[in-house]
């Protein structure tokens, strides 16, 4: 999730080998700051989002290009503007079009500050013990229809939330909940209720 973005470059440096790693980062001002920070650790960045605007289309083309070249793309399913811990279908569409699996990944730190931003951004404090937690791959069939895409979106959302909350509680921390139903756009409320997502 977007709240766990800060430490992702460290993960890839330890497990990624020589395969190039790209992070999808918002083109907004806060995204530019994050982009410069991430670049310091080696990953490349793709500016934009997987939304349906002009910038989103350009970002999606770049994502597909690097995935088909055998590179890896890191994306925050609820970025860049939320709602918190509620996945959009952009990552599902990208995985479907590129015919690649999605690997959920999260982290937590034993001593941290939770910011008051929309995503409840996690800031690890010095001398913390950190834990990175990978989930099982999520495979996306290229022939999925709208119903199938929504099912995969919910699968990703539930899987990553469960993984994140287990990582927090495993360190003795209080789990951060997803945005409540009343915080969501109307079009997402019925889908979440139908999917049984907490």
What is each stretch, according to the model?
Residues 1-53:
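Catalytic core of membrane glycerolipid acyltransferases/transacylases, capturing the structured
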Residues 30-32, 53, 82-83, 109-114:
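Short gly/pro/ser/thr-enriched loop/turn and capping motifs at secondary-structure boundaries
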Residues 40-42, 64-65, 119-124:
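Short, hinge-like loop/turn segments at secondary-structure boundaries
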Residues 48, 76, 104-107:
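Generic beta-sheet signal
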Residues 60-94, 98:
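Catalytic-site beta-strand/loop segments enriched in glycine and acidic/polar residues
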Residues 85-146, 192:
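A cross-family acyltransferase "interaction/gating" segment
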């Amino acid at each position: 999730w977007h709240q766990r973005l800060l430490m992702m470059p460290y993960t890839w440096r330890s497990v990624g080998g020589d395969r190039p790693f790209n992070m999808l980062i918002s083109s907004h001002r806060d995204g530019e700051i994050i982009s410069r920070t991430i670049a310091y650790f080696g990953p490349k960045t793709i500016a934009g989002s997987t939304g349906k605007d002009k910038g989103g289309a350009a970002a999606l083309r770049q994502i597909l290009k690097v995935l088909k070249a055998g590179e890896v793309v890191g994306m925050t399913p609820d970025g860049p503007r939320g709602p918190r811990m509620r996945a959009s279908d952009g990552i599902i569409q990208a995985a479907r079009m590129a015919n690649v699996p999605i690997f959920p990944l999260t982290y937590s730190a034993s001593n941290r500050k939770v910011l008051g931003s929309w995503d409840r951004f996690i800031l690890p404090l010095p001398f913390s013990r950190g834990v990175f937690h990978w989930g099982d791959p999520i495979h996306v069939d290229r022939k999925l229809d709208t119903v199938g895409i929504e099912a995969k979106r919910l699968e990703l959302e539930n899987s990553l939330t469960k993984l994140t909350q287990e990582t927090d509680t495993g360190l003795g921390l209080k789990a951060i909940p997803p945005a409540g139903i009343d915080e969501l756009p109307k079009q997402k409320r019925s889908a979440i209720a139908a999917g049984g997502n907490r």
